[in-house]
Amino acid sequence: TKSVVASQLIPINTALTPAMMKAKEVSPKGIPAEEMSKIVGMQVNRAVNLDETLMPDMVKTYQ
């Protein structure tokens, strides 16, 4: 299964948009790609580098 990764540098406290994310096969696994639409609009609590996997603890209010 694919996970959500950053398709660009995402600064701290930025609200996520679809253009900032892509689905990719990675290890360890992060937020599942099928939840990408669910996290749109949520803010990251730290800077996320290009191609870095989004983990649940990086996204504010992610359940």
Swiss-Prot record:
It holds the Pfam family SAF. It is found in: Secreted. Signal peptide: none annotated. Residues 3-62 form the AFP-like domain. InterPro entries: AFP_Neu5c_C (IPR006190), AFP_Neu5c_C_sf (IPR036732), Antifreeze_III (IPR006013), SAF (IPR013974). Detected in blood serum (at protein level). Gene3D superfamilies: Antifreeze-like/N-acetylneuraminic acid synthase C-terminal domain. Keywords: Antifreeze protein, Secreted. The record marks 8, 13, 17, 43 as: Important for ice-binding. The keyword Protease does not apply. PROSITE patterns: AFP_LIKE. GO terms for cellular component: extracellular region. Belongs to the type-III AFP family. Contributes to protect fish blood from freezing at subzero sea water temperatures. Lowers the blood freezing point. Binds to nascent ice crystals and prevents further growth. This is Ice-structuring protein AB1. It comes from Pachycara brachycephalum (Antarctic eelpout).
